[in-house]
Amino acid sequence: GPRTPLPELAAQWKTLATLGAAFMVAGLAATVGQLLVRVLIQHELGTAALGQFQAAWAISMTYIGFVLGAMGTDYYPRLTAAMKDGAAVNRLVNEQTEVALLLAGPVFIAMLGLAPWVIHLLYSREFAEAASVLRWQVLGDILKVASWPLGFVILAAGAGRTFMLTESLAIAVFVLLTWLGMPLLG
């Protein structure tokens, strides 16, 4: 096949390295934030409460992973193809947000209503308190699903720094709200 000129290859590699570095920093921020939340919970509420949190977190991350993974597989390629047309990008974001909320809505409703049963099915009666934690996490997951189509726009635009900053800000807000909410809500 035709050879790609070296300057063009270098530009492509630079873009990939920049986005890759942004992903790594955002991933590190998420990991540190999750660790901080777990440390806060254990310090303030004890090991049993940390186990309850972890049980709810595992369930939440499993179902939200399916929803967001499917979104990325279908939506991201269409979005990157449309990035030069602002109206098309806007339409895609709106459509994807609506579709994601419609598809995830029944899962959210099921998790809100069936949280005690799901916890009992997957764990044991000792984890019953995790149902209330799972319900709070469902509310956060609704925000995730609603905001991810916009996050994909940042990625499709190649704005690695913006992605890194927004992800880091989101995890910082999560840690802060956990810290502020524990004395009030337990």
Model-derived features with residue positions:
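Short runs within selected transmembrane alpha-helices of multi-pass transporters and secretion channels
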Residues: 1, 26, 30, 34, ...
